[in-house]
Amino acid sequence: MAEEQISFDIYQPFGPSVLKTKLPQIYVDALNKQSDDILNDEEKSKERDWSHNLAEKEKKEISIDHMAINGLPEFLATISKEYTKRVLPEYLPENTKIAFRVWTVSQWAGDFNPMHIHDSNLSGVCFLKIPPE
Protein backbone atom coordinates (compact mmCIF):
# COMPACT_ATOMS: atom_id res chain seq x y z
CA MET A 1 0.00 0.00 0.00
CA ALA A 2 1.29 3.46 -0.81
CA GLU A 3 2.49 5.49 2.16
CA GLU A 4 -0.73 7.43 2.66
CA GLN A 5 -2.04 8.94 5.87
CA ILE A 6 -5.18 7.16 7.03
CA SER A 7 -7.53 9.40 8.97
CA PHE A 8 -9.97 7.91 11.46
CA ASP A 9 -11.81 8.57 14.72
CA ILE A 10 -12.79 6.16 17.47
CA TYR A 11 -16.10 6.66 19.28
CA GLN A 12 -17.49 4.89 22.33
CA PRO A 13 -21.15 5.99 22.37
CA PHE A 14 -22.14 2.85 24.31
CA GLY A 15 -20.38 -0.41 25.13
CA PRO A 16 -17.88 -1.18 22.38
CA SER A 17 -15.71 1.43 20.71
CA VAL A 18 -16.50 2.28 17.09
CA LEU A 19 -13.90 3.26 14.47
CA LYS A 20 -15.11 5.59 11.72
CA THR A 21 -12.99 6.20 8.62
CA LYS A 22 -13.45 6.95 4.94
CA LEU A 23 -12.67 4.13 2.53
CA PRO A 24 -10.46 5.55 -0.24
CA GLN A 25 -12.40 5.98 -3.49
CA ILE A 26 -10.07 3.60 -5.34
CA TYR A 27 -11.29 0.74 -3.10
CA VAL A 28 -14.95 1.82 -3.33
CA ASP A 29 -14.67 1.77 -7.13
CA ALA A 30 -12.90 -1.62 -7.16
CA LEU A 31 -15.45 -3.19 -4.78
CA ASN A 32 -18.34 -1.78 -6.83
CA LYS A 33 -16.81 -3.04 -10.09
CA GLN A 34 -16.22 -6.54 -8.73
CA SER A 35 -19.73 -6.63 -7.23
CA ASP A 36 -21.36 -5.40 -10.43
CA ASP A 37 -19.38 -7.89 -12.55
CA ILE A 38 -20.56 -10.76 -10.34
CA LEU A 39 -24.17 -9.58 -10.01
CA ASN A 40 -24.46 -9.09 -13.80
CA ASP A 41 -23.35 -12.69 -14.45
CA GLU A 42 -25.89 -15.33 -13.40
CA GLU A 43 -23.30 -18.12 -13.12
CA LYS A 44 -20.89 -16.01 -11.04
CA SER A 45 -23.79 -14.86 -8.86
CA LYS A 46 -24.68 -18.47 -8.07
CA GLU A 47 -21.02 -19.36 -7.35
CA ARG A 48 -20.60 -16.37 -5.04
CA ASP A 49 -24.02 -16.56 -3.34
CA TRP A 50 -23.42 -15.75 0.33
CA SER A 51 -27.03 -15.48 1.52
CA HIS A 52 -26.89 -18.69 3.57
CA ASN A 53 -24.28 -17.05 5.87
CA LEU A 54 -26.10 -13.82 6.60
CA ALA A 55 -28.74 -12.70 9.07
CA GLU A 56 -31.19 -11.22 6.60
CA LYS A 57 -32.17 -13.17 3.50
CA GLU A 58 -31.82 -10.40 0.95
CA LYS A 59 -32.13 -11.05 -2.76
CA LYS A 60 -28.46 -10.45 -3.58
CA GLU A 61 -25.65 -11.24 -1.16
CA ILE A 62 -22.33 -12.28 -2.67
CA SER A 63 -18.82 -13.00 -1.45
CA ILE A 64 -16.05 -10.72 -2.71
CA ASP A 65 -12.43 -11.61 -3.49
CA HIS A 66 -10.90 -8.70 -1.57
CA MET A 67 -7.40 -10.13 -2.11
CA ALA A 68 -7.79 -9.28 -5.82
CA ILE A 69 -8.11 -5.57 -4.99
CA ASN A 70 -4.60 -4.13 -4.84
CA GLY A 71 -3.96 -2.51 -1.46
CA LEU A 72 -7.34 -3.30 0.14
CA PRO A 73 -6.12 -6.12 2.42
CA GLU A 74 -3.32 -3.87 3.69
CA PHE A 75 -5.75 -0.99 4.28
CA LEU A 76 -8.10 -3.25 6.25
CA ALA A 77 -5.19 -4.68 8.26
CA THR A 78 -3.89 -1.19 9.06
CA ILE A 79 -7.18 0.17 10.37
CA SER A 80 -7.85 -3.08 12.27
CA LYS A 81 -4.47 -2.90 14.00
CA GLU A 82 -4.81 0.81 14.78
CA TYR A 83 -8.28 0.29 16.25
CA THR A 84 -7.09 -2.62 18.37
CA LYS A 85 -4.00 -0.74 19.61
CA ARG A 86 -6.22 2.15 20.76
CA VAL A 87 -8.84 0.06 22.59
CA LEU A 88 -6.49 -2.65 23.94
CA PRO A 89 -3.23 -1.06 25.08
CA GLU A 90 -1.71 -4.51 25.73
CA TYR A 91 -2.28 -5.54 22.08
CA LEU A 92 0.84 -6.79 20.27
CA PRO A 93 0.27 -6.62 16.49
CA GLU A 94 3.30 -8.81 15.78
CA ASN A 95 1.55 -11.68 17.64
CA THR A 96 -1.69 -11.37 15.68
CA LYS A 97 -2.90 -13.10 12.54
CA ILE A 98 -5.45 -11.09 10.60
CA ALA A 99 -7.98 -12.69 8.27
CA PHE A 100 -10.93 -11.07 6.51
CA ARG A 101 -14.16 -12.16 4.88
CA VAL A 102 -15.77 -9.63 2.58
CA TRP A 103 -19.22 -9.74 1.03
CA THR A 104 -21.74 -7.31 -0.41
CA VAL A 105 -25.38 -6.99 0.52
CA SER A 106 -27.75 -5.35 -1.95
CA GLN A 107 -30.57 -3.58 -0.15
CA TRP A 108 -33.48 -1.47 -1.30
CA ALA A 109 -35.87 0.99 0.32
CA GLY A 110 -37.66 -0.65 3.24
CA ASP A 111 -35.07 -3.42 3.73
CA PHE A 112 -33.43 -3.85 7.09
CA ASN A 113 -30.76 -5.97 8.66
CA PRO A 114 -31.95 -7.56 11.93
CA MET A 115 -29.82 -7.67 15.06
CA HIS A 116 -27.25 -10.44 14.78
CA ILE A 117 -23.87 -11.55 16.09
CA HIS A 118 -20.65 -11.96 14.12
CA ASP A 119 -18.34 -14.80 15.09
CA SER A 120 -15.21 -12.67 14.90
CA ASN A 121 -13.50 -10.18 17.16
CA LEU A 122 -13.92 -7.27 14.75
CA SER A 123 -16.54 -6.57 12.14
CA GLY A 124 -17.14 -3.62 9.88
CA VAL A 125 -19.37 -2.16 7.24
CA CYS A 126 -18.71 -0.03 4.15
CA PHE A 127 -21.52 1.75 2.36
CA LEU A 128 -20.59 1.61 -1.32
CA LYS A 129 -23.62 2.91 -3.18
CA ILE A 130 -26.01 5.23 -1.39
CA PRO A 131 -28.99 6.58 -3.33
CA PRO A 132 -29.73 10.30 -3.20
CA GLU A 133 -32.29 11.29 -0.59
Predicted regions and their residues:
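A short coil-to-beta-strand element that immediately follows conserved catalytic motifs
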Residues: 90-102
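Catalytic core of non-heme Fe(II) oxygenases with the double-stranded beta-helix
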Residues: 101-133
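A generic structural micro-feature
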Residues: 13, 94-96, 116-120
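Non-heme Fe(II)/2-oxoglutarate
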Residues: 2-92, 112
